[in-house]
Amino acid sequence: MVRKKNPPLRNVASEGEGQILEPIGTESKVSGKNKEFSADQMSENTDQSDAAELNHKEEHSLHVQDPSSSSKKDLKSAVLSEKAGFNYESPSKGGNFPSFPHDEVTDRNMLAFSSPAAGGVCEPLKSPQRAEADDPQDMACTPSGDSLETKEDQKMSPKATEETGQAQSGQANCQGLSPVSVASKNPQVPSDGGVRLNKSKTDLLVNDNPDPAPLSPELQDFKCNICGYGYYGNDPTDLIKHFRKYHLGLHNRTRQDAELDSKILALHNMVQFSHSKDFQKVNRSVFSGVLQDINSSRPVLLNGTYDVQVTSGGTFIGIGRKTPDCQGNTKYFRCKFCNFTYMGNSSTELEQHFLQTHPNKIKASLPSSEVAKPSEKNSNKSIPALQSSDSGDLGKWQDKITVKAGDDTPVGYSVPIKPLDSSRQNGTEATSYYWCKFCSFSCESSSSLKLLEHYGKQHGAVQSGGLNPELNDKLSRGSVINQNDLAKSSEGETMTKTDKSSSGAKKKDFSSKGAEDNMVTSYNCQFCDFRYSKSHGPDVIVVGPLLRHYQQLHNIHKCTIKHCPFCPRGLCSPEKHLGEITYPFACRKSNCSHCALLLLHLSPGAAGSSRVKHQCHQCSFTTPDVDVLLFHYESVHESQASDVKQEANHLQGSDGQQSVKESKEHSCTKCDFITQVEEEISRHYRRAHSCYKCRQCSFTAADTQSLLEHFNTVHCQEQDITTANGEEDGHAISTIKEEPKIDFRVYNLLTPDSKMGEPVSESVVKREKLEEKDGLKEKVWTESSSDDLRNVTWRGADILRGSPSYTQASLGLLTPVSGTQEQTKTLRDSPNVEAAHLARPIYGLAVETKGFLQGAPAGGEKSGALPQQYPASGENKSKDESQSLLRRRRGSGVFCANCLTTKTSLWRKNANGGYVCNACGLYQKLHSTPRPLNIIKQNNGEQIIRRRTRKRLNPEALQAEQLNKQQRGSNEEQVNGSPLERRSEDHLTESHQREIPLPSLSKYEAQGSLTKSHSAQQPVLVSQTLDIHKRMQPLHIQIKSPQESTGDPGNSSSVSEGKGSSERGSPIEKYMRPAKHPNYSPPGSPIEKYQYPLFGLPFVHNDFQSEADWLRFWSKYKLSVPGNPHYLSHVPGLPNPCQNYVPYPTFNLPPHFSAVGSDNDIPLDLAIKHSRPGPTANGASKEKTKAPPNVKNEGPLNVVKTEKVDRSTQDELSTKCVHCGIVFLDEVMYALHMSCHGDSGPFQCSICQHLCTDKYDFTTHIQRGLHRNNAQVEKNGKPKE
């Protein structure tokens, strides 16, 4: 019946919804179960497994020694059915609610204890510590010291009990397991919340079942103290995920870190209390009713959500959470006894579920003492919103009564204590548990005299914004009210937030309690991040500065300001939700042009101006008329009106924060990665740099622990400050604190300010540089003056563009760069160095926003001249890392080593580590051979993968194009296959090669030297750059006439001999280089055997780029060769570097031609067979490798094993293979095919000398590259494959 959930972190904090409060420590678990428990009276508890069991367990922990048959029953039932559905074991068993001996409780535990979530986490860890056999005194873990304190009746004096509670809470803090875990020295002390288990009762329960079955976890509210994110449930996992993802920037896939999660929950709790005014009393308050108040108030306060208790036949069966949002008033209902949850607006399904699944629970709550019930019901009616998730538990919100002083000032709250056993009530039925609203004072008494006496002594003149329930007045003004800001603080603040929440229902709920309280309200602009918090009385609001902000900065008249109670920022439209849009500041005067149309739509009382007074934030002037208020500002405070102080805190409510973040560009401080999606930058840091970046600032940490420590020490403190400010405002109404969020959005509504063009002070720039070098010091936040911040809105455009002109440090935009990076970036961006020192607008620059590097405010702006910037770091490792990452990004300077494309959906690596496009990579993976270039067609640099076509209408027309690709591809493949020659690709994209029209080689050299400053591989890049620009040219060469060449072949000596020989060549350079050994054929290319250059033709000149000329040259040469066989003879004076190749005639170009030398090879050699038998490399199917028919092959060549020319013995027009019977339509394909036939047989592979059985076997062998291993090939003197 009970489904056990075993989340990594258990929320033991509250076994029952009531226990939510209990974790607070105010009520012991027993108290949490009080209602049920009492209802479950020990005898009846058998069926009431949840509450009873929990109570028993609690009682167990409280009094292990006293067994009671009824408690035994309950325990049995719990054990048998685990009906409770709670996963927590009884405290005595070391269950989730451990009962620690007094000494076991530690402050650490207490901290963990502080919040239910934390408790949940710690609990599983520490629960084993609970000793069933703890002494009753030690065991008495009234979960909160409050219970101890609560019982004035107790033997201990209230003060003593309070002290005890404090001590326990301090100890319990460490436990964090559950408030219950705190042992109270006074075993008899009933759990707080007035759940007063009589000692005997508790003892009986405790002793009854040393091994009570684990109870199902009760539901509670989990809330992020940073942004207000919250939910209602029994598992803190989502809260931890949220915190990790949105506040630590950690990916949840790396969640397996129990220690970090525990710390997060502990932090969550500690922050909550640190925000509280009574932080100094945290230890006591953790277990005090105050905490109970805080936690229980959470459901009510959370973003306008509140809980609706669902009862069936008088039994509290679950909770409905009303969540006003843009989807309407949605509720989700959850069963109190199991995890059954559904979304909807009706509790009918929950009631049916309860009757079907938990029929045995029906009586459980009925037995609860009627005394408590009536009060419970009454209180529920009077304070519906305050009802805690566990209405069945007495001492919960539904029973809470506000205690007021003579002047109607709320001073505290009381909850009736429900005795466990009528026999043990001893006339204390009327006893209630009281706790102070302003501190952690609590007591048990039959009257409120003690509380009032305490209030008179301690807080006589103080009214702090504790519970700010009354928002009715502010409802009409809800548009400016943002409840999220204060969500993180202590109960008082929490309640304050509630006040802020604009939902009317919530306000109504609170109206019963304390409309008299001072409240802190956050006002925020709907269009930008202007925000401030004010403390004020219940009947006034301080909206003047906001209205003036709207009018002055956004040109929005107050009458047109919209407000929706369900959309905190007011940015909603009727179709998005069911809420009513109001115009809270509309004057509704018929002569007002702004209200003319509004009057048609506004409901009569929407403005509510008559009910609420507007107070000036600079003086005590109040008026119900907004117009009068604005006139007051203009007449009295005009000079000071703009003096709004911003709080330095940058961790504000989540509402505006996230939307603001989206508009900002995020740049990596370690490389040039830029994105507008914050999650991507966090992921980039994790994956690319193996570090974690703080979401709130530019701090990066090597591990999650240090990141959490940074967050705790820096940003949590900031939060505390903000909260404190919010509350202090109550006492200093004269100052408005604007709370800038982490990011600032800039709207076109902003008028440009002259300050935009002013240079930033040197101190600002220096400070930023210091911070960069120091590696993310947080001092920026304190150093940056409020004046700097005040200009944020004016300079927002610069900020968004990443301009260092603004003190980005103060905005959280500063992304520090390491010293070496900064230097190289400064070098690289020297043209724009001055931009770093000027706060000039960037509008005039025709460069993408991304061209500016946010992270390098001091000369770090990226130069827009170069399309891509390469990260240069002093360390080779980081350099290589960033380069490899850079290459992987689309269009960032890498091109395919096989087909030279720069555009692909995915970059892959070939066997040698070089980058290849997706198509080439997949082809090579599938066929074990590089992708033939004849199936690659490029259009504007983009590959068009087409089918091979054997029939071409105009073969001549395609020769040039194919020739280029054939040469590029064959050379590329040669290098791909050669591990010796594989090097990292050059970083220049084709845009450098083709778009930079440098007319002479000297300019290429200059370009190379320029590149030198961009990359750490300076010598390599220089040679690569030169080689690319010099050797790319053979692809577009123009030769007037081959016969004209009469110059000295010596011209072919390579200009870039030294550089070109660099093994770290570019993808193109490798095509131009001869193989290391004439016979060496790197593996992988189907046409590698033809790739060996014969000699360096002086074919490089920028002017020869015409495809037509290139084609004309080859056509002329093709025609000349058959009729001029002497051209194929060795030219005596030719410096032929590859003696084993048939020499081509040397063509002398005009003297101004720059010779590239022997590094160039051209497609001419494709038609010539190596003189040695089969030096050709592994041959992929020659049919596939269609090369342009540049030269007519002279039939099957007779191979002579000397350095002589291969002569043709067949008619040159014969293109049919005599062995395979294949007829080729062009001579080159025929030559390629014939070169695969060895000399020892018709079907011998010339590459590996393998003898195939027939032509099919031979064709398969060649196409698939099934050559024998390298060792055997080498042994036979054949080239390695």
Curated annotation (Swiss-Prot):
Residues 40-49, 163-189, 380-391, 961-977, 1040-1049 have a biased composition (Polar residues). Residues 1163-1281 are annotated as: Transcriptional repressor domain. Residues 53-63, 148-162, 488-512, 980-995, 1060-1072 have a biased composition (Basic and acidic residues). Its main location: nucleus. Keywords: Disease variant, DNA-binding, Isopeptide bond, Metal-binding, Nucleus, Phosphoprotein, Repeat, Repressor, Transcription, Transcription regulation, Ubl conjugation, Zinc, Zinc-finger. It comes from Homo sapiens. There is a cross-link at residues 766, 1201 (Glycyl lysine isopeptide (Lys-Gly) (interchain with G-Cter in SUMO1)). This is Zinc finger transcription factor Trps1. GO terms for biological process: negative regulation of transcription by RNA polymerase II; regulation of chondrocyte differentiation; regulation of transcription by RNA polymerase II; skeletal system development. InterPro entries: TRPS1, Znf_C2H2_sf, Znf_C2H2_type, Znf_GATA, Znf_NHR/GATA. The modification Phosphothreonine is found at residue 751. Residues 985-1184 are annotated as: Mediates interaction with RNF4. A zinc finger (GATA-type) spans 896-920. There is a cross-link at residues 1192, 1201 (Glycyl lysine isopeptide (Lys-Gly) (interchain with G-Cter in SUMO)). Transcriptional repressor. Binds specifically to GATA sequences and represses expression of GATA-regulated genes at selected sites and stages in vertebrate development. Regulates chondrocyte proliferation and differentiation. Executes multiple functions in proliferating chondrocytes, expanding the region of distal chondrocytes, activating proliferation in columnar cells and supporting the differentiation of columnar into hypertrophic chondrocytes. Sumoylated. Sumoylation in the repressor domain inhibits the transcription repression activity. Sumoylation on Lys-1201 is the major site. Appears to be sumoylated on multiple sites.
